[in-house]
């Protein structure tokens, strides 16, 4: 009788251990799925933010300012202030994208695509002037990335 009780006790302990392992496996799988969902949400938020900024850049006032910049015309003090704010918001969005990338919420390929827009953005002397004015307000790692892209362009 002791043999049967020992055997049953061992069998039950083994089944409990197996159930624990299976539970851990399913917990890991669930965490992986939640991570995928979180990454997709981060990407969507970045996309929404980018779209919102792009739409702000399409207002008649901002289009006029952009056309002046493209034609190397001087901006009025009011236009300069408005564009400084717009440019700052645009860079803050990129800084947030870098943060999302640094914590693994945006993959490397996507981050590389985001960086491509910097290459055209910082060909403008006006944008370089704005960047030098405001760069100290950004995260050090982000500053290094932007400065590296600027150096690469020049």
Located regions from the model:
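Membrane-proximal alpha-helical anchors
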Residues: 2-75
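An amphipathic alpha-helical interaction surface
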Residues: 78-154
């Amino acid at each position: 009788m002791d043999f049967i009780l020992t055997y049953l006790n061992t069998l039950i302990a083994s089944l409990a251990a197996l159930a624990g392992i299976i539970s851990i496996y399913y917990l890991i799988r669930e965490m992986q799925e939640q991570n995928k969902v979180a990454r997709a949400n981060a990407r969507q938020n970045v996309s929404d933010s980018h779209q919102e900024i792009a739409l702000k850049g399409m207002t008649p006032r901002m289009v006029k300012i952009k056309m002046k910049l493209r034609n190397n015309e001087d901006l009025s003090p009011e236009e300069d202030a408005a564009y400084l704010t717009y440019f700052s918001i645009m860079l803050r969005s990129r800084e947030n994208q870098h943060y999302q990338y640094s914590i693994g919420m945006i993959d490397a390929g996507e981050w590389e695509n985001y960086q491509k827009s910097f290459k055209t953005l910082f060909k403008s002397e006006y944008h370089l002037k704005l960047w030098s004015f405001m760069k100290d307000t950004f995260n050090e790692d982000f500053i290094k990335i932007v400065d590296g892209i600027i150096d690469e362009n020049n």
